[in-house]
Amino acid sequence: MSITSEKKKSLINIYAIKEDDTGSSFVQCAILTERISNLTEHFKVHKHDHHSKRGLLILIGRRRKHLNYIKRKFGNEAYQELIEKLGIRK
């Protein structure tokens, strides 16, 4: 269910604004999107796992808050670019 450290490092390298940038909203959105996609695949097999579904909803809400921050702080262009890179719809 969790992502490997290698996958997390590759996401950090792709979405980091500057070197050693692990905490920016862009990186956190990318990591949350990866975790959400892993949980979505889990639910295709385990349809009745309601406890993990609550965790999924929490992750989606957390990602939504980061995306709203990016839109407010960096503008609509950065927001749209990130959504396209992540492959999520709005």
From Swiss-Prot:
- Please list the disulfide bridges: none
Query: Which GO terms label this protein's molecular function in UniProt?
Result: rRNA binding; structural constituent of ribosome
Gene3D superfamilies with a match to the protein in the record: 6.10.250.3130, S15/NS1, RNA-binding
Q: Which UniProt keywords apply?
A: Ribonucleoprotein, Ribosomal protein, RNA-binding, rRNA-binding
Pfam families linked:
Ribosomal_S15 (PF00312)
Task: Say if the entry is tagged with keyword tRNA processing.
Answer: no
What InterPro entries has UniProt attached to this entry?
A: Ribosomal_uS15 (IPR000589), Ribosomal_uS15_bac-type (IPR005290), uS15_NS1_RNA-bd_sf (IPR009068)
Alphabetical list of SMART domains matching this protein: Ribosomal_S15
**GO terms, biological process:** translation
GO cellular component annotations of the record:
cytosolic small ribosomal subunit
Q: Which family does it belong to?
A: Belongs to the universal ribosomal protein uS15 family.
State the oligomer form and interacting partners.
Part of the 30S ribosomal subunit. Forms a bridge to the 50S subunit in the 70S ribosome, contacting the 23S rRNA.
Q: What does this protein do?
A: One of the primary rRNA binding proteins, it binds directly to 16S rRNA where it helps nucleate assembly of the platform of the 30S subunit by binding and bridging several RNA helices of the 16S rRNA.
Descriptive protein name: Small ribosomal subunit protein uS15
